[in-house]
Amino acid sequence: MLKKFIEDIEHHFEPGGKHEKWFALYEAAATLFYTPGLVTKRSSHVRDSVDLKRIMIMVWFAVFPAMFWGMYNAGGQAIAALNHMYAGDQLATVIAGNWHYWLTEMLGGTIGAEAGVGSMMLLGATYFLPIYATVFIVGGFWEVLFCMVRKHEVNEGFFVTSILFALIVPPTLPLWQAALGITFGVVVAKEIFGGTGRNFLNPALAGRAFLFFAYPAQISGDVVWTAADGFSGATALSQWAHGGSGALINNITGAPITWMDAFIGNIPGSIGEVSTLALMIGAAMIVYMRIASWRIIAGVMIGMIAVSTLFNVIGSDTNPMFNMPWHWHLVLGGFAFGMFFMATDPVSASFTNSGKWWYGILIGAMCVMIRVVNPAYPEGMMLAILFANLFAPLFDHVVIEKNIKRRLARYGK
């Protein structure tokens, strides 16, 4: 019945129809439920029914474990901090002055010390969902606008860009900054260069980089990671950068942060970056379906392990980051998220198999170098991936030229 309705109204959106200019929106909605009706005129090159939309939706689903854990963790961190700082009437006053808090209680949750998993998820959702909705609406507007101007269908890559961007920002990010960031990512880093398939930079990371340099106070520092009014606490990566492994403590309880705490995600940070375990679950899904390249992931790990081990051997009495072992680099900051979901972006990464190895190795090595050597910015994954994006075409060019020369030497005579 739904398919018949879609087919009955299709002629209104085709060239000459009364809704011709809205074809991009119609096509996006129709292909959300059914595969396109287009067929090839000559020998078909289609191997199966999985198209771009299905691939992007699978990536969208793959980040759900990290997204749900991120909402739970953001809410849990905020509730613990609030109950640590306030009590009684003072806590009630704080709740009444923040719409996230009173909305959580209005929906049946609680901000008190007795809060359960549901209340933590609910509070985290009041922070994440508005950011995601803002990013989706604003970014979707630009996507549809460019599609209407260029007269082609809406590219499904924005489904992934929108949720990835929303997951790599702090839960306290102002909504207007989220709108600015995704605007920069979609318009400047993607559409100006031709749209999906033609951008050489990762749009989500480009948008975050714009916010980092334009509004550093809302995207970094000690006050943006825990959604509790009046609370300040550094991320685990910043703690290590300033005091080594001994400085890793829970900002609320003062208890030491263990490797397992960081691996599971019981630490403050960007919404989707805190749980390496949840990220691994999603990554296993897209690697199994061959959407993400295992070569890139392996290359990132090789580069990270090699350079971090080198710094461990060199050592330093003044810079604690020299002594961070590779297994801590893996679980702190945005390394795991970047390795699994950003570095493997098929558009901005290298295409050739050999190029993927070198592309991944460069990312892992650059991430550790930025973390260790840069005194002002302990995180390095974002800049490392954007830097490697610039070199991805060069890697492919070198690999292709080398293959051509080898074949000419073999068969040219």
From Swiss-Prot:
It comes from Vibrio campbellii (strain ATCC BAA-1116). The modification FMN phosphoryl threonine is found at residue 235. Composed of six subunits; NqrA, NqrB, NqrC, NqrD, NqrE and NqrF. This is Na(+)-translocating NADH-quinone reductase subunit B. Disulfide bonds: none annotated. NQR complex catalyzes the reduction of ubiquinone-1 to ubiquinol by two successive reactions, coupled with the transport of Na(+) ions from the cytoplasm to the periplasm. NqrA to NqrE are probably involved in the second step, the conversion of ubisemiquinone to ubiquinol. One of its GO terms (biological process) is sodium ion transport. GO terms for cellular component: plasma membrane. NCBIfam families: nqrB, PRK05349.1. GO terms for molecular function: FMN binding; oxidoreductase activity, acting on NAD(P)H, quinone or similar compound as acceptor. Signal peptide: none annotated. It is found in: Cell inner membrane. It catalyses: a ubiquinone + n Na(+)(in) + NADH + H(+) = a ubiquinol + n Na(+)(out) + NAD(+). The chain crosses the membrane at residues 55-75, 128-148, 163-183, 267-287, 296-316, 324-344, 357-377, 380-400. Its cofactor is FMN.
